[in-house]
A protein has these predicted regions:
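GNAT-family acyltransferases
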Residues: 17-134, 145-173
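Positively charged n-region of N-terminal signal peptides that target proteins for export
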Residues: 1-4
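A short acidic/glycine-rich loop-to-helix N-cap element
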Residues: 135-141
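Bacterial N-terminal signal peptides
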Residues: 6-14
Length: 173
């Protein structure tokens, strides 16, 4: 049943078309920094540190992505490099936006934030996860609060959904 719900959710929020998600005349926010972490666009150069975070956090990622089975236990570093290259291209093409959450010294990836095109209603769907050790340290609600405020303040969306989060919808006023 959860798989069916996830598929329906993807039909509603996933942008599959070739058009830009955010028009070219709008400047794309490039992230922000707090006292605890930095959020910035993910690149292929992040592959090894991102891979370590992903593999530490498979269960949390499956929950954050509403039952999606990515990544599998057999996910490889090379597959991660290819995945990040695709995410980097989609960012440049303005089709979707993936941000890495890193420690301030950039030594450790703490999580990831995905901003995807909405369909049939919401302008955007935002998914996020933090690595297991950061989750255990209480980073998840801190990240969620900071991301919600940043999206509301910096992005050109009127209706944003946060699937799987306690307050799933935010409408800008």
């Amino acid at each position: 049943m959860r798989g069916v719900a996830y598929c329906l959710l993807l039909l509603i929020v996933a942008g599959c078309g070739s058009s830009e998600f955010v028009p070219g005349d709008i400047e794309i926010p490039t992230g922000f920094e707090t006292a605890n972490f930095r959020l910035r666009p993910i690149t292929v150069a992040d592959a090894e540190k991102d891979y370590a975070a992903v593999m530490e956090s498979i269960g949390l990622i499956h929950t954050a992505l509403l039952g999606d089975r990515w990544p599998t236990d057999s996910f490889t570093l090379e597959q991660n490099r290819k995945d990040l290259a695709k995410k980097e291209r989609r960012f440049e093409q303005r089709k979707s936006f993936t941000f890495t959450v890193v420690s301030l010294d950039e030594d450790r990836v703490l999580g990831c934030v995905y901003i995807n095109k909405g369909r049939r209603g919401p302008d955007a769907a935002v998914f996020m996860w933090v690595r297991q050790s950061s989750y255990d340290d209480g980073l998840d609600p801190v990240l969620e609060s900071a991301v919600r405020e940043w999206v509301k303040r910096e992005w050109p969306f009127e209706w944003v959904v946060y699937p799987g989060r306690t307050a799933p919808e935010v409408s800008a006023e």
